[in-house]
């Protein structure tokens, strides 16, 4: 049995991804923020139905001029609810750690980014729990120790680990669909 999967998000989303017995669509935009969800190619996800959708957004919304995390939280909650309308299962990829250099394009200090990231993730964990949306964790020290030279994007090892996490969830959902279809 094959399942339809979508992976939606910013440049951390793999450009290509294959899992046996799965039809995977990638909706990826480099530098994507929450407000890009209503623009192509991200909004194109709403034109189809899926068995499983991963959402990997939020990290690029944490900027030096972000004085309140509420708009990011509200935006992510809204996107997750819209994705629930088109998919049987939704997974939120927790906002990852980053190590910004002094001259980064967002102007955000590491301490501020980490504070805001934690606040957003903690709020979304509670929301996702109530909405039956599971979290894919990329916030561990292991992932932050395997960042590329820019301090933002995952290095090869972390990209492999992320793909393995996605593969595990996809295989679990496919097995559950098979079991649900045979009962």
Question: Where in the sequence are the language-model features?
Answer:
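Conserved SGNH/GDSL esterase-like catalytic core that processes O-acyl groups on lipids
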Residues: 2-81, 99, 115-118
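Alpha/beta-hydrolase-fold catalytic nucleophile elbow
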Residues: 56, 93-94
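Short acidic/His/Gly/Ser-rich catalytic and metal-binding motifs that mark active-site loops
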Residues: 62-63, 99-104, 143-146
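A short helix->loop->beta-strand "cap" motif at the edges of active sites that frequently abuts
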Residues: 85-90, 133
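Short beta-alpha junction loops
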Residues: 87, 94-99
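Acidic carboxylate-rich catalytic motifs and surrounding loops in phosphoryl-/glycosyl-chemistry enzymes
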Residues: 95, 133-147
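Substrate-gating cap/lid alpha-helix
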Residues: 100-139, 152, 156
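Histidine-centered active-site loop/cap adjacent to the catalytic His
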Residues: 147-183
């Amino acid at each position: 049995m094959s399942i339809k999967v979508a992976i939606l998000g910013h440049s951390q989303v793999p450009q290509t991804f294959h899992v046996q017995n799965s039809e995977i669509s990638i909706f990826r935009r480099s530098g994507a923020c929450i407000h890009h969800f209503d623009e192509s190619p991200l909004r194109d996800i709403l034109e189809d139905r899926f068995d499983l959708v991963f959402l990997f957004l939020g990290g690029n919304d944490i900027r030096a001029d972000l004085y309140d995390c509420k708009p990011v939280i509200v935006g992510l909650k809204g996107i997750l609810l819209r994705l629930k309308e088109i998919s049987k299962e939704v997974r939120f990829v927790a906002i990852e750690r980053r190590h910004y250099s002094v001259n980064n394009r967002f102007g955000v200090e590491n301490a501020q980014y980490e504070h805001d990231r934690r606040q957003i993730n903690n709020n979304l964990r509670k929301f996702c729990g109530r909405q039956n949306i599971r979290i894919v964790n990329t916030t561990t020290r292991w992932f932050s120790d395997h960042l590329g030279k820019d301090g933002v994007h995952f290095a090869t090892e972390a990209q492999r680990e992320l793909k393995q996490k996605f593969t595990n969830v996809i295989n679990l959902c496919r097995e559950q669909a098979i079991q649900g279809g045979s009962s």
